[in-house]
A protein has these predicted regions:
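General marker for long, soluble alpha-helical cores
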Residues: 2-188
Length: 188
């Protein structure tokens, strides 16, 4: 029995050197980049986004954080994961902050407590810690607290202390520790 050679022909649409299997995606890409001056790596990420059938509105979110390719890729990843990337598609955020917000979205944390560029990376991690451990993060998710102060407030919450007296950003870490020590003695 003779084997038949089968030939398959596929149409490929090429725009600016990028290959698309679907005309719609190629046309959307072409329209999106028209009269805009993107760098080569930005075009690659934008092309990848359109190849995933994203609409121009979603691609705009990706471009908004450019020209940083790591930020653009993280926004693309979040969109493909059906996350609300509006929480971190913000040019003011550092990539590490964006990654922490992405982590929170993936893990169903209430990212609205820390999805803000006013928080340092360490402050964000302290808030995430509280969310993961079911602490009352609203007791310390104020950017006026330093990371070290947040740690003291967290410690007080974990020890079951009423931390109201500690919620003063003017207190030094040493003062907070002394107050916590007195509260622990009163608790016994």
């Amino acid at each position: 029995m003779k084997e038949e050679n089968k030939m398959e022909i596929q149409l490929v649409y090429i725009v600016e050197g990028y290959k698309f299997k679907e005309y719609k995606n190629a046309a959307n890409f072409e329209e999106f980049i028209k009269n805009k001056n993107f760098k080569e790596y930005e075009l690659r990420i934008i092309a990848d986004a359109f190849k995933e059938n994203l609409n121009s509105e979603d691609v705009e979110k990706i471009v908004k954080v450019g020209p940083d390719s790591a930020k653009m890729k993280l926004v693309l990843k979040g969109i493909l994961e059906n996350l609300d990337v509006d929480f971190y598609a913000n040019k003011e955020l550092a990539i590490e902050q964006m990654e922490l917000i992405h982590y929170g979205l993936v893990n169903n944390l209430k990212v609205e407590y820390y999805a803000n560029p006013i928080y340092t990376i360490k402050q964000m991690k302290a808030i995430i810690y509280g969310l993961i451990n079911n602490l009352k993060v609203e007791s310390y998710n104020d950017h006026k607290y330093t990371f070290e102060q947040m740690k003291e407030l967290i410690d007080g919450l974990e020890k079951g202390l009423n931390i109201k007296i500690l919620q003063n950003e003017k207190l030094t870490v040493d003062e907070m520790k002394q107050i916590k020590s007195r509260l622990m003695k009163l608790k016994k």
